[in-house]
Amino acid sequence: MARGLGAPHWVAVGLLTWATLGLLVAGLGGHDDLHDDLQEDFHGHSHRHSHEDFHHGHSHAHGHGHTHESIWHGHTHDHDHGHSHEDLHHGHSHGYSHESLYHRGHGHDHEHSHGGYGESGAPGIKQDLDAVTLWAYALGATVLISAAPFFVLFLIPVESNSPRHRSLLQILLSFASGGLLGDAFLHLIPHALEPHSHHTLEQPGHGHSHSGQGPILSVGLWVLSGIVAFLVVEKFVRHVKGGHGHSHGHGHAHSHTRGSHGHGRQERSTKEKQSSEEEEKETRGVQKRRGGSTVPKDGPVRPQNAEEEKRGLDLRVSGYLNLAADLAHNFTDGLAIGASFRGGRGLGILTTMTVLLHEVPHEVGDFAILVQSGCSKKQAMRLQLLTAVGALAGTACALLTEGGAVGSEIAGGAGPGWVLPFTAGGFIYVATVSVLPELLREASPLQSLLEVLGLLGGVIMMVLIAHLE
């Protein structure tokens, strides 16, 4: 027993160590960001204050309000001394206008310097990359992020969904559920909401809150539509496969269903065993009298095998649904990589590293779901390799689009409004309907603790990746 639990302990310790190091890195990064923000706020406040004092002193230096009024309005009139106080008030409003002009100029300078920094930070901007080099970089990066996780999958000591690997597989499934939920709520949905939030912040006035609710509401509806679509697909597949299963053993399934509602479940099972034994005796007597073997010996037991076969088919549906969601997700990753390489070689490399860090834990979770669905290790890896087609298609789409418009919108979170939230809905459905129920099986307290830690490890990984992005 101790030898069997060695691998789960090792995986749990590795996940906890990885999460702890990530939290330390995130804490240091957050401290630096806070220091930069405080320094920027102090610099901006001091500069604005000195400028405002200088302008206020300038308004007092004029002495007479009518001269400043004539400069502001462009005409000259005679004013008495009693009106000069009103003119000073106008001079104060002029100072406010000048301050707003300073803010606009400062924002323009900041934007210009930021753009210059981006060009200098990316050593190879898109004008320096010809078409062949651009395609080579983008497709090579896509192949890298698709093939790199397989080196990690080779190290996982899980060959199939067997009792010998059940404890480790349950921990990997919990890690997969945490990764799927974290990816949906911390990566896909926030990226889909980012352009809408920026749009509402840029609009002045108090009427933007109503106009900004439409796009945000559409993102939520697309998430729900993804959940409903995956539910409809799974029910349809189960209906097709279920009708085939009931044709083999309808009587056994019906009696077993009725027996599960009563409190005497053991009595029902013993009666079924007795009836099956009687049927076996009758069939053997018929075979002896006829001198042939028209009925197989395992005939009465076949409905039970058909029921198990139906359950296996139902489990494979969840694996295929997860592959469909992963295919759409890889398509968006390919769009982001293609658009980033159009913006520059440095930006493309940075985006590739970010997507790679995101894909490794995600592919480990997908592997666990496929193995739990009934696939062997080789079959699961082959099916995951097919999802790389989605990433290559996304990269090609971003490179073929004029100016990389579609790819840049997807990379920034805008894109077609249904891609990211619909994929998030699929991830939420797979995690909550297909994966989490498998973790509710009876287990030892230590195994349950490791499963909870695995789920938290998957969420923490997505938190760290979102922080790096």
From Swiss-Prot:
Residues that bear Phosphoserine: 275-276
Chain segments annotated as transmembrane: 10-30, 138-158, 169-189, 214-234, 381-401, 417-436
Modification type Pros-methylhistidine: residues: 66
Keyword Cytoplasm: no
Annotated tissue distribution: Widely expressed.
Compositionally biased residues, Basic and acidic residues: 42-56, 66-114, 264-285
One Gene Ontology MF term: zinc ion transmembrane transporter activity
Record keywords, A-Z: Disease variant, Endoplasmic reticulum, Golgi apparatus, Ion transport, Membrane, Methylation, Phosphoprotein, Transmembrane, Transmembrane helix, Transport, Zinc, Zinc transport
Residue ranges the record marks as coiled coil: none
Impact noted for substituting residue 275 to A: Loss of phosphorylation in response to Zn(2+) treatment and of cytosolic Zn(2+) release
Disease link: Agammaglobulinemia 9, autosomal recessive: A form of agammaglobulinemia, a primary immunodeficiency characterized by profoundly low or absent serum antibodies and low or absent circulating B-cells due to an early block of B-cell development. Affected individuals develop severe infections in the first years of life.
Its job: Transports Zn(2+) from the endoplasmic reticulum (ER)/Golgi apparatus to the cytosol, playing an essential role in the regulation of cytosolic zinc levels. Acts as a gatekeeper of zinc release from intracellular stores, requiring post-translational activation by phosphorylation, resulting in activation of multiple downstream pathways leading to cell growth and proliferation. Has an essential role in B cell development and is required for proper B cell receptor signaling.
Protein name: Zinc transporter SLC39A7
Gene: SLC39A7
